[in-house]
Protein backbone atom coordinates (compact mmCIF):
# COMPACT_ATOMS: atom_id res chain seq x y z
CA UNK A 1 0.00 0.00 0.00
CA UNK A 2 1.23 3.49 -0.83
CA UNK A 3 0.27 7.13 -0.34
CA UNK A 4 -2.58 7.03 2.21
CA UNK A 5 -5.24 9.73 1.71
CA UNK A 6 -7.66 10.71 4.48
CA UNK A 7 -11.25 11.95 4.46
CA UNK A 8 -14.22 11.88 6.81
CA UNK A 9 -17.82 12.79 7.52
CA UNK A 10 -20.21 12.23 10.44
CA UNK A 11 -20.41 8.48 9.75
CA UNK A 12 -16.95 7.41 8.65
CA UNK A 13 -13.25 8.02 8.58
CA UNK A 14 -11.95 6.79 5.22
CA UNK A 15 -8.37 6.06 4.21
CA UNK A 16 -7.66 5.26 0.57
CA UNK A 17 -4.40 3.72 -0.64
CA UNK A 18 -2.81 2.65 -3.90
CA UNK A 19 -1.90 -1.04 -4.01
CA UNK A 20 1.19 -2.21 -5.90
CA UNK A 21 2.55 -5.62 -6.80
CA UNK A 22 5.55 -6.90 -4.85
CA UNK A 23 7.22 -8.01 -8.08
CA UNK A 24 7.78 -5.04 -10.36
CA UNK A 25 6.01 -2.49 -8.13
CA UNK A 26 3.19 -2.04 -10.66
CA UNK A 27 -0.10 -0.48 -9.62
CA UNK A 28 -2.70 -3.20 -9.20
CA UNK A 29 -5.77 -1.51 -7.69
CA UNK A 30 -7.05 0.95 -5.13
CA UNK A 31 -8.39 0.12 -1.68
CA UNK A 32 -10.50 2.22 0.69
CA UNK A 33 -10.59 1.46 4.42
CA UNK A 34 -13.86 2.81 5.85
CA UNK A 35 -14.06 3.05 9.64
CA UNK A 36 -17.33 3.46 11.55
CA UNK A 37 -16.77 6.89 13.13
CA UNK A 38 -19.20 6.60 16.08
CA UNK A 39 -17.58 3.27 17.02
CA UNK A 40 -14.10 4.68 16.47
CA UNK A 41 -14.82 7.34 19.09
CA UNK A 42 -15.18 4.54 21.65
CA UNK A 43 -11.67 3.34 20.83
CA UNK A 44 -12.61 0.53 18.45
CA UNK A 45 -11.55 0.54 14.79
CA UNK A 46 -12.93 -2.23 12.60
CA UNK A 47 -12.83 -1.03 8.98
CA UNK A 48 -14.88 -2.17 6.05
CA UNK A 49 -12.42 -2.58 3.17
CA UNK A 50 -13.36 -1.90 -0.44
CA UNK A 51 -10.55 -3.39 -2.51
CA UNK A 52 -9.77 -4.18 -6.12
CA UNK A 53 -10.88 -0.77 -7.44
CA UNK A 54 -9.31 -0.52 -10.89
CA UNK A 55 -7.75 2.54 -12.51
CA UNK A 56 -10.68 2.71 -14.93
CA UNK A 57 -13.01 2.87 -11.93
CA UNK A 58 -10.99 5.65 -10.34
CA UNK A 59 -9.05 3.44 -7.96
CA UNK A 60 -5.74 5.28 -8.26
CA UNK A 61 -5.61 8.17 -5.76
CA UNK A 62 -9.34 8.04 -4.99
CA UNK A 63 -9.19 10.82 -2.43
CA UNK A 64 -11.99 11.01 0.18
CA UNK A 65 -13.24 14.46 1.15
CA UNK A 66 -12.79 16.36 4.38
CA UNK A 67 -16.49 16.92 5.06
CA UNK A 68 -17.29 20.19 6.83
CA UNK A 69 -20.88 19.35 7.77
CA UNK A 70 -22.53 17.81 10.81
CA UNK A 71 -25.41 16.46 8.73
CA UNK A 72 -23.96 15.33 5.37
CA UNK A 73 -24.48 11.55 5.17
CA UNK A 74 -22.57 10.94 1.92
CA UNK A 75 -18.78 10.76 1.83
CA UNK A 76 -17.40 11.81 -1.57
CA UNK A 77 -14.19 10.64 -3.26
CA UNK A 78 -12.60 12.32 -6.28
CA UNK A 79 -10.43 10.48 -8.82
CA UNK A 80 -8.51 11.91 -11.76
CA UNK A 81 -8.79 9.81 -14.92
CA UNK A 82 -7.32 11.47 -18.04
CA UNK A 83 -5.33 14.69 -18.41
CA UNK A 84 -5.81 15.08 -22.15
CA UNK A 85 -9.56 14.51 -21.86
CA UNK A 86 -9.89 16.37 -18.52
CA UNK A 87 -11.98 13.55 -17.06
CA UNK A 88 -12.65 12.57 -13.46
CA UNK A 89 -15.00 10.52 -11.26
CA UNK A 90 -16.89 11.57 -8.14
CA UNK A 91 -17.58 8.33 -6.26
CA UNK A 92 -19.55 7.98 -3.03
CA UNK A 93 -19.77 6.08 0.23
CA UNK A 94 -23.35 5.82 1.51
CA UNK A 95 -25.35 3.55 3.81
CA UNK A 96 -25.15 3.38 7.58
CA UNK A 97 -22.10 3.92 9.74
CA UNK A 98 -21.87 0.17 10.36
CA UNK A 99 -22.67 -0.90 6.78
CA UNK A 100 -21.13 1.46 4.21
CA UNK A 101 -21.71 1.09 0.47
CA UNK A 102 -19.10 2.16 -2.09
CA UNK A 103 -20.44 3.36 -5.46
CA UNK A 104 -18.16 4.19 -8.39
CA UNK A 105 -19.16 7.50 -9.94
CA UNK A 106 -19.80 8.35 -13.56
CA UNK A 107 -17.02 9.65 -15.78
CA UNK A 108 -17.36 13.43 -16.20
CA UNK A 109 -15.38 16.06 -18.08
CA UNK A 110 -13.97 19.17 -16.46
CA UNK A 111 -14.72 22.41 -18.30
CA UNK A 112 -11.69 24.35 -19.54
CA UNK A 113 -9.84 21.86 -21.71
CA UNK A 114 -7.21 19.22 -21.13
CA UNK A 115 -3.58 19.38 -20.08
CA UNK A 116 -0.42 17.29 -20.21
CA UNK A 117 0.49 14.87 -17.44
CA UNK A 118 2.81 16.19 -14.76
CA UNK A 119 5.34 14.59 -12.43
CA UNK A 120 9.03 13.79 -12.54
CA UNK A 121 11.96 16.17 -12.18
CA UNK A 122 10.78 19.11 -14.29
CA UNK A 123 10.38 22.21 -12.09
CA UNK A 124 13.37 24.59 -12.30
CA UNK A 125 15.26 26.13 -9.40
CA UNK A 126 18.39 28.22 -9.12
CA UNK A 127 21.44 27.54 -7.01
CA UNK A 128 24.23 29.32 -5.21
CA UNK A 129 27.93 29.37 -5.92
CA UNK A 130 28.24 26.23 -3.81
CA UNK A 131 25.79 24.18 -5.87
CA UNK A 132 26.75 20.85 -7.48
CA UNK A 133 27.93 20.67 -11.07
CA UNK A 134 24.50 19.72 -12.39
CA UNK A 135 21.60 21.01 -10.32
CA UNK A 136 18.66 18.63 -10.28
CA UNK A 137 15.19 19.80 -11.23
CA UNK A 138 12.28 19.33 -8.80
CA UNK A 139 9.28 17.00 -8.96
CA UNK A 140 6.30 19.39 -8.59
CA UNK A 141 3.71 16.65 -8.17
CA UNK A 142 1.48 14.91 -10.66
CA UNK A 143 -2.08 15.48 -11.82
CA UNK A 144 -3.69 13.27 -9.18
CA UNK A 145 -5.52 14.73 -6.18
CA UNK A 146 -2.99 13.81 -3.53
CA UNK A 147 -3.07 16.59 -0.94
CA UNK A 148 -6.74 16.99 -0.03
CA UNK A 149 -10.35 17.18 -1.17
CA UNK A 150 -12.97 19.31 0.62
CA UNK A 151 -16.77 19.06 0.87
CA UNK A 152 -18.46 22.31 1.86
CA UNK A 153 -22.03 23.62 1.51
CA UNK A 154 -23.05 21.17 -1.19
CA UNK A 155 -19.86 21.37 -3.27
CA UNK A 156 -16.67 19.32 -3.58
CA UNK A 157 -13.39 21.17 -4.08
CA UNK A 158 -9.96 19.89 -5.09
CA UNK A 159 -6.70 21.08 -6.65
CA UNK A 160 -4.00 19.47 -8.78
CA UNK A 161 -0.75 20.13 -10.63
CA UNK A 162 -1.01 20.21 -14.42
CA UNK A 163 1.37 20.88 -17.34
CA UNK A 164 0.56 23.42 -20.04
CA UNK A 165 0.12 23.90 -22.95
CA UNK A 166 -1.38 20.45 -23.38
CA UNK A 167 0.27 19.74 -26.76
CA UNK A 168 3.80 21.02 -26.09
CA UNK A 169 4.08 21.69 -22.34
CA UNK A 170 6.59 24.29 -21.16
CA UNK A 171 5.59 24.75 -17.49
CA UNK A 172 3.33 23.57 -14.68
CA UNK A 173 0.29 25.31 -13.23
CA UNK A 174 -2.03 24.84 -10.26
CA UNK A 175 -5.63 24.01 -11.16
CA UNK A 176 -8.59 24.20 -8.76
CA UNK A 177 -12.03 22.73 -9.30
CA UNK A 178 -15.47 23.03 -7.68
CA UNK A 179 -18.03 20.26 -8.33
CA UNK A 180 -21.72 20.15 -7.50
CA UNK A 181 -21.83 17.22 -5.09
CA UNK A 182 -25.33 16.03 -5.97
CA UNK A 183 -24.56 15.66 -9.69
CA UNK A 184 -20.78 15.35 -9.84
CA UNK A 185 -20.70 18.03 -12.53
CA UNK A 186 -18.28 20.93 -12.91
CA UNK A 187 -19.46 24.14 -11.21
CA UNK A 188 -16.42 26.43 -11.22
CA UNK A 189 -12.65 26.36 -11.43
CA UNK A 190 -9.54 28.13 -12.56
CA UNK A 191 -5.76 28.04 -12.84
CA UNK A 192 -2.75 29.75 -11.29
CA UNK A 193 -0.43 29.99 -14.27
CA UNK A 194 2.33 32.00 -15.90
CA UNK A 195 1.73 31.10 -19.58
CA UNK A 196 5.11 32.55 -20.61
CA UNK A 197 7.16 30.33 -18.28
CA UNK A 198 9.77 27.87 -19.49
CA UNK A 199 12.48 25.92 -17.70
CA UNK A 200 15.08 28.62 -18.40
CA UNK A 201 13.46 32.07 -18.74
CA UNK A 202 12.70 32.87 -15.09
CA UNK A 203 8.94 32.44 -15.54
CA UNK A 204 6.90 31.07 -12.67
CA UNK A 205 6.02 27.43 -12.26
CA UNK A 206 3.41 26.27 -9.72
CA UNK A 207 2.90 22.87 -8.10
CA UNK A 208 1.77 20.74 -5.15
CA UNK A 209 -1.46 22.61 -4.37
CA UNK A 210 -3.72 22.11 -1.37
CA UNK A 211 -7.10 23.76 -0.89
CA UNK A 212 -9.24 25.00 2.00
CA UNK A 213 -12.79 26.41 2.01
CA UNK A 214 -14.33 28.31 4.93
CA UNK A 215 -17.94 28.69 6.06
CA UNK A 216 -18.36 31.72 3.78
CA UNK A 217 -17.18 29.74 0.72
CA UNK A 218 -13.96 31.76 0.56
CA UNK A 219 -11.07 29.66 -0.73
CA UNK A 220 -7.34 29.42 -0.05
CA UNK A 221 -4.88 27.61 -2.32
CA UNK A 222 -1.43 26.85 -0.92
CA UNK A 223 1.35 25.76 -3.30
CA UNK A 224 5.00 25.96 -4.34
CA UNK A 225 6.32 28.62 -6.74
CA UNK A 226 9.46 27.81 -8.72
CA UNK A 227 11.59 29.69 -11.25
CA UNK A 228 14.88 29.07 -13.02
CA UNK A 229 16.40 32.17 -11.39
CA UNK A 230 15.07 31.74 -7.84
CA UNK A 231 14.79 29.21 -5.03
CA UNK A 232 11.49 27.41 -4.44
CA UNK A 233 9.03 29.63 -2.55
CA UNK A 234 6.05 28.90 -0.28
CA UNK A 235 3.03 30.72 -1.71
CA UNK A 236 -0.74 30.98 -1.69
CA UNK A 237 -3.66 32.57 -3.52
CA UNK A 238 -7.07 33.48 -2.14
CA UNK A 239 -10.56 34.15 -3.43
CA UNK A 240 -13.66 35.55 -1.77
CA UNK A 241 -16.94 33.85 -2.53
CA UNK A 242 -18.00 37.10 -4.23
CA UNK A 243 -15.02 37.19 -6.61
CA UNK A 244 -15.66 36.54 -10.29
CA UNK A 245 -16.09 32.91 -11.31
CA UNK A 246 -12.87 31.14 -12.26
CA UNK A 247 -10.59 33.69 -10.60
CA UNK A 248 -8.15 33.93 -7.72
CA UNK A 249 -6.58 37.07 -6.32
CA UNK A 250 -2.86 37.71 -6.82
CA UNK A 251 -0.31 35.12 -5.71
CA UNK A 252 1.38 35.90 -2.38
CA UNK A 253 4.81 34.48 -1.53
CA UNK A 254 4.76 34.20 2.25
CA UNK A 255 8.16 32.54 2.63
CA UNK A 256 11.02 32.95 0.17
CA UNK A 257 13.22 29.94 -0.39
CA UNK A 258 16.70 30.35 1.08
CA UNK A 259 18.69 27.77 -0.86
CA UNK A 260 18.46 25.08 -3.53
CA UNK A 261 17.08 21.63 -2.74
CA UNK A 262 18.68 18.37 -3.79
CA UNK A 263 17.71 15.17 -2.00
CA UNK A 264 16.45 12.10 -3.84
CA UNK A 265 17.19 9.41 -1.20
CA UNK A 266 18.62 7.23 -3.95
CA UNK A 267 15.38 7.19 -5.95
CA UNK A 268 16.43 9.64 -8.67
CA UNK A 269 13.31 11.71 -7.94
CA UNK A 270 13.48 15.11 -6.26
CA UNK A 271 10.21 14.76 -4.34
CA UNK A 272 8.88 18.01 -2.95
CA UNK A 273 5.77 19.16 -1.07
CA UNK A 274 3.93 15.83 -0.96
CA UNK A 275 2.31 16.54 2.39
CA UNK A 276 1.78 20.28 2.19
CA UNK A 277 -1.70 21.27 3.27
CA UNK A 278 -4.27 24.03 3.73
CA UNK A 279 -6.95 24.13 6.45
CA UNK A 280 -9.55 26.34 8.10
CA UNK A 281 -9.04 27.40 11.71
CA UNK A 282 -11.66 25.53 13.78
CA UNK A 283 -11.86 28.39 16.28
CA UNK A 284 -13.73 30.66 13.85
CA UNK A 285 -14.24 28.61 10.64
CA UNK A 286 -13.03 31.64 8.67
CA UNK A 287 -9.27 32.03 9.13
CA UNK A 288 -7.00 29.98 6.87
CA UNK A 289 -3.70 28.24 7.57
CA UNK A 290 -1.36 26.61 5.08
CA UNK A 291 1.89 24.69 5.51
CA UNK A 292 4.25 24.69 2.53
CA UNK A 293 7.81 23.52 2.00
CA UNK A 294 10.94 25.62 1.49
CA UNK A 295 14.69 24.91 1.67
CA UNK A 296 16.64 26.56 4.47
CA UNK A 297 20.00 28.20 3.93
CA UNK A 298 22.81 25.70 4.06
CA UNK A 299 25.30 26.07 6.87
CA UNK A 300 28.68 27.38 5.79
CA UNK A 301 31.22 24.57 5.43
CA UNK A 302 33.72 24.18 8.23
CA UNK A 303 37.20 25.11 7.04
CA UNK A 304 40.17 23.93 9.06
CA UNK A 305 43.86 23.31 8.69
CA UNK A 306 47.15 23.30 10.42
Over which residues does each language-model region extend?
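C-terminal PAP-associated
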Residues: 1-306
